[in-house]
Amino acid sequence: MSEAQSELQASLLAKALPYMQRYENKTIVVKYGGHAMGNAELGKAFAADIALLKQSGVNPIVVHGGGPQIGAMLTKMGIESKFEGGLRVTDQKTVEIVEMVLAGSINKEIVALINQTGEWAIGLCGKDGNMVFAEKAHKTIKDPDSNIERVLDLGFVGEVVEVDRTLLDLLAKSEMIPVIAPVAPGRDGATYNINADTFAGAIAGALSATRLLFLTDVPGVLDKQGQLIKELSVAQAHALIADGTISGGMIPKVETCIDAIKAGVQGVVILNGKTAHSVLLEIFTEHGAGTLIVP
């Protein structure tokens, strides 16, 4: 390594030090999904980021999705995907596949990636330690012609109703990094598939996490000129939804951020998971890497 390279590395570490101190012993929940999950190099970079957070004294918790992988497995098993109002209907056969893919193959792949860095990850879902309980989701859709709302029956799609932080508190005191699949039981004995974003928000809220990071396929919230908005308050986010600046699929993402803040999360960040080491850039640099939403 040349002298110039050594000086550059030393400078970068010196700049990162205040942020490492700021987040020491703090909980950061990272929702991992999107393009990064299907890219081997980005997956390794993500695992390295999570490992470095742990090594820096942070308490990282990973929550992951897996929609495309679920769809691929359903096709492979010859099970037709059904949709109501654009939302997947999860019948008994489908929820069994969902649990197999999310809590099985995907979860263990992420655990293995983190373990390869030398850290110690453990794979979980909402069933473990009675961590999360869910109930059947109640979704409605409005007919554009009649303006009449009707209730959608999405089967075993659930909403989080209770989070018990006991297991996560125990893991925070250990060397383990929890990797959690968004599958949870109901008090009725059923198994429910839960939207990974809202699941991550519920976990982060229950832990009063310092940060909740959503890794997406976009840089963050953009203004009407297509430029990244670095920071928004909840009130500003509501205003941008009202005036159409925030639209389409970004609306439910931002609404989930707002719900998480109301639940006790100190700040939520939407950032681009397609950028290698975006987690480290967000946490350990002055300007971050996405859009920070705060109370």
Curated annotation (Swiss-Prot):
GO cellular component annotations of the record: cytoplasm
EC top class named in words: transferase
InterPro entries the record matches: AceGlu_kinase-like_sf, AcgluKinase_fam, ArgB, Asp/Glu/Uridylate_kinase, Glu/AcGlu_kinase, NAGK-C
GO molecular function: acetylglutamate kinase activity; ATP binding
Entry's EC annotation: 2.7.2.8
Pathway as given in its UniProt record: Amino-acid biosynthesis; L-arginine biosynthesis; N(2)-acetyl-L-ornithine from L-glutamate: step 2/4
Reaction equation(s) it catalyzes: N-acetyl-L-glutamate + ATP = N-acetyl-L-glutamyl 5-phosphate + ADP
Principal cellular location given in the protein's record: cytoplasm
One of the protein's GO biological processes: L-arginine biosynthetic process
Site entry: Transition state stabilizer: K31, K253
Superkingdom, natural source: Bacteria
Keyword Transmembrane helix among record annotations: no
Cellular location(s): Cytoplasm
Keywords, comma-separated and alphabetical: Amino-acid biosynthesis, Arginine biosynthesis, ATP-binding, Cytoplasm, Kinase, Nucleotide-binding, Transferase
Gene3D superfamilies: Acetylglutamate kinase-like
Positions annotated to bind substrate: G66, G67, R88, N193
Biological role stated in the UniProt entry: Catalyzes the ATP-dependent phosphorylation of N-acetyl-L-glutamate.
Family: Belongs to the acetylglutamate kinase family. ArgB subfamily.
Name under which the protein is recorded: Acetylglutamate kinase
Species assigned in the record: Rhizobium rhizogenes (strain K84 / ATCC BAA-868)
